[in-house]
């Protein structure tokens, strides 16, 4: 956590200099974050920043869209919740004038369950939930393949969709949900592919994953401003 706090303070300073906060020194720097366990470290970083003279206000969101909208329209100075592939996809889709200014923590997307303690316990026909945005859909399907549950077309990468599934020997049933509600669906599905910070809010221990991706370096969370 200390590393996150130090990185957070450095990034807050960078956002203040490079982002909208530099132009409105009489107002607090407004930072959009997603509701989740990781905000504990962010709240500490904000307190430390305030002690050093930088006024920061955290604004929590429960969805994936509003934070980028807020930074783009100027109601937020920055946000801290997304990895680079997701940011790039939103810029392409929405035309946002957003830029990543600092690297945050790396969070491994993983398979979680409230009903089963191991992948081997998943029954045939198990219901699996994951985020429905294109980038995280592809990411989730790659993790399901890495875990040995499905097979995808060769070299499909993060653009994978259900149409790219070539083998599903356990006849898994897939539920594509808005990203912020996937964790809450854990009571209704056999497992979900989601980030640790979101499952913590749903009362699941982040370390209890049935399977976590092996390499998550490309999916480090970024500080984003305009």
For each feature predicted by the language model, list its residue ranges.
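Bacterial N-terminal signal peptides that target proteins for export
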Residues: 1-10
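Immediate post-signal peptide segment of exported/extracytoplasmic ligand-binding proteins
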Residues: 21-30, 49-54, 119-125
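Short helix-initiation/N-cap motifs at beta->coil->alpha
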Residues: 58-69, 156-184
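Periplasmic-binding protein-like
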Residues: 103-112, 200-226
């Amino acid at each position: 956590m200390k590393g996150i706090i130090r990185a957070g303070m450095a990034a807050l300073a960078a956002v203040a200099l490079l982002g909208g906060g530099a132009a409105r020194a009489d107002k607090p720097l407004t930072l959009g974050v997603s509701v989740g366990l990781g905000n504990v470290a962010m709240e500490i970083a904000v307190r430390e920043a305030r002690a050093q003279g930088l006024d920061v206000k955290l604004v929590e969101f429960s969805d994936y869209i509003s934070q980028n909208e807020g930074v783009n329209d100027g109601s937020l100075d920055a946000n801290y919740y997304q990895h680079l592939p997701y940011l790039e996809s939103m810029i392409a889709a929405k035309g946002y004038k957003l830029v990543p200014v600092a690297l945050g923590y790396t969070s491994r997307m993983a398979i979680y369950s409230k009903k089963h303690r191991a992948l081997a316990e998943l029954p045939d026909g198990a219901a699996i939930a994951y985020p429905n945005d294109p980038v995280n859909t592809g990411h989730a399907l790659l993790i399901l393949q890495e875990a040995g549950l499905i097979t995808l077309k060769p070299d499909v990468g993060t653009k994978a969709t259900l149409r790219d599934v070539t083998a599903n020997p356990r006849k898994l049933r897939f539920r594509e949900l808005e990203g912020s509600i996937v964790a809450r669906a854990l009571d209704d599905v056999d497992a979900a592919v989601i980030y640790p910070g979101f499952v913590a809010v749903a009362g699941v221990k982040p370390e209890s994953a049935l399977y976590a991706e092996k390499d998550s370096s490309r999916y480090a969370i970024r500080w984003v401003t305009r």
